């Protein structure tokens, strides 16, 4: 910051090599300055996916901005173990809990969708879920419910003829908690037609999770068999 004051306004960077730069001030004076080499080194480690080396560098420097950069790089590269380490070092409890939640998702597509959602790309997250093999319909519906995108959640449920009662159940809870009555015509129709059984909805949710676990196990077995 002090160097920025010395450079003054309308200064131009002439060269930047390694951690050294030359700046020409508005009055024509040529000045040199240096920056920390650690962000550059960290960037090299992240690009090469050398996560242990990156974490070791951050522990040595003990800089929160450096940990933050590592967390961002790890999340962007879907390396959740390193993201967990970085967020724990920063004591970002809420973000750490979210990463732990993502790590607990059985299927890679589910994890990738949550990362996209974390990066504020909900449409991309939905696309990942619906284009999975098999499509993760329940997760796509629940994601839209979490985002209060009720019409989209219902649209997916009706298109695939699955979990319409789940959408209605959470919609009803939402309206009740906000002391509101239903005004959307299609939701009104379905509330009159569809039975909402909380136990049945919970059972279907459990079955969806079991199915994801089964698929994850079968994929793991296939990968192991492919090694021989």
Language-model segment annotations:
Residues 1-228:
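Extended alpha-helical assembly domains of large eukaryotic scaffold proteins
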